[in-house]
Every structure is written in C-alpha cells, then in structure tokens.
Amino acid sequence: MSRTVDPIDHLYQMVKDGISYGIVHQVAEDEYHSGRTIRIHDQQLINFGLCSYLGIEADERLKQGVIDAVNQFGVQYSVSRAYVSNRLYTELEDLLGQMFDGKHVLVTQNTTLGHLAALPVIIEPNDAVLVDFQVHNSVQTTLSQLRTKKVHIEYIRNDDMAQLEERIVALQEQHRRIWYLCDGIYSMYGNAASITTLESLLNRYEQFHLYIDDAHGMSWSGKHGRGFVLNQIEQHERMIVVVSLSKSFSAGGGAIVFPNFDLYHKVKSCGGPMIFSIPINPPTLGAAVASAKLHLSDELPALQNQLMANIRYFNQMAEAYQLPLVNATENPIRFIGVGLPKLAYAVVSRLQELGFYTNIAAYPAVPMRRSGIRITVTNHHTKEDILALIQAIAQVLPVLLREGGSSMDKLYKTFKMSNPDSLTMPANEEGRSSSAALKLEHHTSIQEIQSKEWNQLLGGRGFEWDFLHCLERTFENQPLPENNWAFHYYIVRDSNGVPVLATFCTKVLLKDDILESGEVSKAVEQLRVDNPYYLTSNYLVMGSLLTEGDHLYLDRQGNWQEALSMFIEELQAEQARCHANTIMLRDFSIHDEELAEWMKQHGYLSRAMPESNVLILQCEDEQDYVSQLSRSARALIRKEVLAFEHMFEVDIVTCDSPTPSEALIEDLHNLYLNVQRRKHDINLFALPQNLWSEMLKHPGWELLVFRIAPEHGGDPEGRPVGFMSCYKGENHYVMSMVGINSQYTESHHLYRQTFYQSIKRAIQLKLPVVHLGIDANKEKQRFGAATHATNVYYQTSDHYAYQVLDNIKANLGSALAVTR
C-alpha cells in the first residue's frame, strides 16, 4: 500500500464535512445585493463573510462605470493584450499609477494570473526563492514553474525574520538574487508581515528582493488606498507589490506595482497570462476605472476611517467579552479560535441559525487543532451588528466547546494565548468532566504499574512489563537527545476498577520525514550533513521505536469512546507539557472503520504505515516448517539457505551467557549501522551502542550472532558477519534489529540466513507467532509471513515541516522531469 497522502483527499473530505453542516457551497438567494445582509435557505443573515471591506461594491458610480463600458465596448473584448488592449486598460493603469505615486502598474486578469505572469519572468535560474509558509496559495502555484528552471526554493516559517535573515546570509554567495515571497496581510489569521524589518533587510543585503502580495491590504489602508504595505514604507527599488482589484477595490482583476519600467515592460511582454489569456472584460474595467477615481477623490479617507472604527470596535468588544481573538491587529480579517474542525463547523453552523453568516477556517488552511471562525469586517456593518455577533459568539462558543469535550481554558492553551484572569464561564465549563464511571491513570514508569495486570492487558502482544522496564533503563541518561525517551503509560478504569483502555507512549525526537519515501529521506539526509537535527521535532508516539503491533488495549464492549476521549485529552495535555509537535497513534487495522471515523472527528489525519509481517508457525521442526512453504520458496531456501547453513556458526547470546566483550559489542553495533545507514524507508536516528549490552541484562532478549569459518571465506579473526536481536515473549518471538556485513549478502546469502535461523530458533522455543518486522515484504513472504496493513493516525500543531517536505518532494519530481 502506498504511504503517499494526496492532499486533495483531505481537502475534499473537509469540504464534504462543511457541506454536511450546511456552511459551504451555499447559494445566496438575494434579489439584490446590499452588502450588509445575505439570504441563505430563506433566512436573512448579517453578512460577515465579504472581502469588499470599504463597502463600495454597490456604489452607483461603479455601476454606472459598468453600464458605460458595456454601452461603449460590449460585454467582451476577446483578444490577447499582446496584440491590442481596450483603451480602458490604459486609463485604468494611468489612474493606478497616480494612486501608487507614479509607479509603473500592470493590470492583470486577477492576482493568481498576475503571479503566474510575473514570477516565472522576474526570477531567473541562479536565483533563490524563500517562501513564507503561510503565503497565499495563488503565490505557491507558481513554484512548479520555477522548479522547471531549477530555481532553488525553500520555505520560511511565517514571518520569521530571524530565519529569513539567516537564510539570506547562507545563500548569498551561491545565488545572484534572493527573493522572499510573502503576504502583507495573511488571509486566515489576519496577521501582518513585519514590513519595517523587511525594509531593513532590503537596505542591508543588496541581493535581497521582496515580492509581496497585498491583496487584503488594498484600498482600506494608505494614501489613495495604495495598501497596507505601502502605507508602512516607500516602495523599495528591489520590491514588487501585488494588489487585488477584486476585494476592497470592488471591481475585478489584479495589479502589479513595479519599481521601474524595465520590469514592468518585461512582465507585460513575456508573462504567460499576459500573452495567452483573455483580458478583463469591459464591464469590469469600467467598474475598476470608476473605483480608481473614487480612490483618488477626497471621499476615500472618510471610508477608511469608518472601516477602522468598525475594526477597533470589534477588537474592543472581543476583548470585553473575553473571546479568543487570535490576532488583535487592526485590519478587516478577524479570527476567533475554536479548536478542532468539528467544533468550528458547529460554531459557524450555530451562528448561522442565530442570523450571522461567517466563514470557517479549517485544515489544511490552518493547523488541524487551530481551526476557527474567520470574520471580515466591512463598512456595511453597524456597531449594533458587530456587538450582536460578538454576543452570539460569547453565548454559543463555551456551550459548544463543552458539548464537544473542550473548554475555553483548553482553547486558549491550544492557541498559546493567555486566558483572561476575569474569565467566568457557565457551570461545568471546564470541559469534559470525567465520567463518574471512568477514571484515568497516567504513569511515567512501568514500575508504577503491577506487572501481572499489565502483562494480562498487553504482555501477550509483545509489550511485557520486564521488556518495557528494560527499555526505560536503556533510553535514559544518553549523551544524544534522540536516545533519551520519556515513557508514558495510560490506563482508564471503569467504576469497578476494571481496565477499559491501556497503552503506552514515548516522547522521542524523530526525523520529520519518518513516513516519507526513501527517495525523499535521502534528499533530506543531504541537508542534514551540516545540521543532523534539521527537520526533526519531538513526537508523542504510541508504543516505542522498538515495538510493533497493536499497542492499544481497548474493551469495545465497555464505554470505549469515553475512555478513548479521556486518553486523547490527557495525551494532548502531555503534548503541551513536553512541547511535542506531533502525536502519532500507530499500528491500527485499516479495516476498523468505526475507529477511523472517531479519529477523524477528533482531528486526526491518517496514512498507511509500512506493512508488518507475521509468521504463524504450525510445525514440529524446521523440516516440517520448510515443507509447508510454497514450491518456489522451498526451492529458494534449499538452494540459498540450507546449502550454505553448514558454513555458519550461530551463537545464541543471552543474559546467562558470559558478558560480551566491548570489542564484540562494537562489532555488533557497526554491523547494525551498516543496515541502518542504508535504510531510508523508515528514517530513524541510530540507536545507541549500549543497547545491545542492556538487552542482554534481560532474560527475554537474546542475540543470534553469525560467524563464517575462515575456510568458507569468513573473517580470519572470527569476527561476526551478522546478528539478529530477538525478544522471547510468552507465545511470540520478535525479530527486532538486524546487523549485516554486506560483503556476505550475495556470496553467502547472509540476510536470508539470519531470517531462517531466527525462525528456526522460534521453532525450538515452541513460540508459534514470529514477528518479522516491517519492509522487505517479498523476502519475508518467501519465509511464509503474512503482511498486515495498518494505519497511523497523527495530529500536528505546526505543519511547517510537512510544507518543507512537500517542497523537497516537488523539487525531486521536477529534477526527474528535467532529467527525462
């Protein structure tokens, strides 16, 4: 099964969820557009979803501009601008030039096509491009074209000026120019770019260039409405600003403001959409000309002041009613945090029932647990409208959070906001009160749990008490951070003290490409040469890196959903305490649709895990075992395993054996590293060298150490050529880690010999279930193993690493395409 996740699948599912709540794909039923209200499902709603912030979209002068243009030029002017332009284009660009203090302005069909026209032309193969993680999707759509030119592309955390400067310094010797692509006002949370800091970087680094999309800053800010960005600073000579004529400007199209004529003319002449796309139709141009004239008039400041008064009033009321306003900047986009998408859907739906139209902001536009209500403030709104909306949110939000198992306090923590000291909540506001019938225990050492009970719950799956105690002892006080694991054990009991749920998790530093393809991980490893902790973060992982299988004991006959909710809630609290970016719940059956739906509703994404391999032994001895294999497998084993078996000496090293020498432990570790360094499909840090000696302090562990006699081509000093570390459970045998000297893989079929001898050992111990681990499925199937497909459910608080990985994958794809 492919582990690749199609983002379209996630997006489509989120849209379908929105449709089921009746809050997306809706149709306005108004006979006439007023701006203040909208009719949906025969209900008149106050409209807080428009981006026409100044409220001039129904201005009579703009309407007359449309009428005049239609009367003069018809409804369409269907010819490429590369040949000829309607004269309204010239008039509009002249007026926009006046608005932008004499700069050269190119009108485009919309901002998206403007980006597609400009960026592939102005950015050259030897340039580097730094992309803000949150920059609008319309900007990011151009990156595929830039990759075909082999342009170097990296992502920067949202408005992280320190990271931006660090990358400018790092790239300036290898690249002629370094571009930063960002927004002026970001379209979800409404946060603003650090414009003055960007100006400082432009002044300090001659190779630095800025391309900024100020679509949401146009009209309501700045002299003549030139936008948020150019209201902060003068346009720099190495700075290009893109604005929208479709939002607050209230017409249609986009515009690019260039610092000089040469860039303007080059994009106009060579930009793909400028040559091949149909231009803006005359009615829209007529409205745009009328809007530009209004912007140049004395009326604009009053409109801007009116809107700013509404924005400030919204912020004041949100603070007064103690709402989680995520960003209190003064711009028309307001965002009230809610949490999980299902809660945001519920709040937006309930507000619609109460007479308010708002927008949902949910994954993938924002992180999964940081969904919310996106509200746009316009001049259509009265203070009474704004206050009524604030009061409605204050009424429904705590109630719906409580019903959904959350609370205002948890919400503030999710968004890393301070909870107002005077916050007062309705009775029982503190979220999901623990069910009287259930109680959760959280332990940080297996020694705090009775071994007999634990083994009854999970010991038979390979997670015995003694085994976990061994892991705790091994992965503490290590010199490297990736080898220090924190263990967490969870048990949920019913009123009689009987466990309904039990599991364990580890907090561990992982590589963020752990579930990516080997090709991607190899590319990331090249980037880790100078920084081994690049693209790594703390994870809370169900199970551990040395365990495999179903780690969750869940009594589905009991109150399992409530138990699971309590566990997840405590796990998320631990995530905040230990600063883990991702929760990863792994090894669940792909056929458990009920659990999959539960996970989806609680904001967990899923993807396929590498398939695991399990062998069920039903034989008396190894001869009987081989006889039960397929004909081709029998032939292969006889030819490449049994025919070489006499060449091998296999030592079984246990806790009762003499203590292995330091030299032997070092040899074994080097054999392990031979495999680990080439294994990128599950990209993990190397385990510590003392693991092997610690294993041998535990009666459940044993090492099968392989040597080849010198007369058969082995090491003349008798050094091992391979090993398999195995764990003996009550009824199972786990082949955990393997080490191989690759020199003997082809000549002596060493890899297959390690598998055969491990299975032979399980037969001798009369352990009927053999866990052969993940990957190399075809090879393991030859030995009779069956593959098991499982899912991992994960939730991350910050998607930056995944955006970077997507960029790496896209770069790899472009490189392959160019090669072909």
Residue spans for each PLM region:
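PLP-dependent enzyme catalytic core of the Aspartate aminotransferase-like
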Residues: E60, Q64-D68, Q72, D94, ...
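Conserved N-terminal alpha-helix of the aminotransferase class I/II PLP-enzyme fold
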Residues: Q64-N110
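Conserved PLP-binding catalytic core of the aspartate aminotransferase-like
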Residues: P301-R312, Y321-L354, A365, V377-N379
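A conserved beta-strand-loop-helix scaffold within acyl/acetyltransferase catalytic domains
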Residues: S433-A523, Q572, T582-E746
